[in-house]
Amino acid sequence: MLCGDVESCRVWFMSAEHLTRRCEKACTHHSRLVENMFHIMTGKAAALSERVEVLSRRSIREKLLCYFGLQTGGDDCGSFHLPFTLSALADYISADRSAMMRELRKMKEEHLVDIDRGQVTLHHALA
């Protein structure tokens, strides 16, 4: 069920033109709707841009380091929580899960990164 636990709901269909043009009354709720749609679209565009940045790397190691760098804001050392499972991370970087895990093990042995229950810690620059 689309509405979850709600007993009744309403779906409002509207044309794209209705979203992109201001109404004659310049009402606040319409302005807020346009603003919210803009924020959603820019968030999705940023996420797609980051994904392209990661996928443009050749090796699994380069993809992982690029992704980790994006998550830490480019800090030399940093820590963050993976927003998904390691299997989903392999899908995100378009890599075989076992090959990705092998590369993560090598990176851990080289003291580049630690991963514990989804918590990723970087130990030095990712250059």
What do the PLM-derived regions correspond to, one by one?
Residues 6, 29, 55, 95-96, ...:
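Residue-level signal for short amphipathic helical patches enriched in basic/charged
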Residues 19, 38-49, 64:
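Hydrophobic alpha-helical core bundles mediating ligand binding, dimerization, or RNAP-core interactions
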Residues 23-30, 48, 71-77:
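Basic, amphipathic alpha-helical hairpins
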Residues 30-34, 53, 78:
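Residue-level recognition of alpha-helical structural elements
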Residues 63, 67-127:
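Phosphate-/nucleic-acid-contacting segments
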